[in-house]
């Protein structure tokens, strides 16, 4: 099974816990929080009630063990944030899934909305999320077990790029976004106004490639999606899948460096 969480900006916490619970043993820790003082906050564990519709029976109960334990891969990229990082982190820490793609966004903060009398509200950061192995993803993100870059993605934006962002409380290396070489070259060529006609055709080609790449998300095509192909190859090879479980824990986070043009320098 493949969970495609690329460009998933997140959602409700209970939804993330529910998705995680569908793949983890009952009672397994999914996520916890800590405040500024470092004291433990809430801790949420995997329970059937988290994914069962009210009044319905457990759809996973009674399934053969071989079905419950099928290989799972999770696809992530720099657009995977918040709740999608909670799911990725939980399945990664429990070695239930192999994470494939590129480093996630790094949005590990908990916000509380405080309504005001005039109808507006203030969103206040009150704590940070931690994975089952007590990792903070804040400004660092989830490191994939198997890194596969997306050749069609020319720019990566992450939490660490935001001015005034909260740093990683565990001292983890912050991971910034990156402008890939081809994007920089295209910008420089445009500024210099060189080979206008050729550049125009190249721009159309890139637009076509981007449209095809977006379309492949809705109509999955491994031939055009290297990350999806890597995920498929893993689930088709159980031995390789098992070897890849937890690989990210054995390597440090990679810090992407922004490329700059000569004018920027």
Task: Place the predicted regions along the sequence by residue.
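C-terminal "post-core" interaction segments
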Residues: 1-265
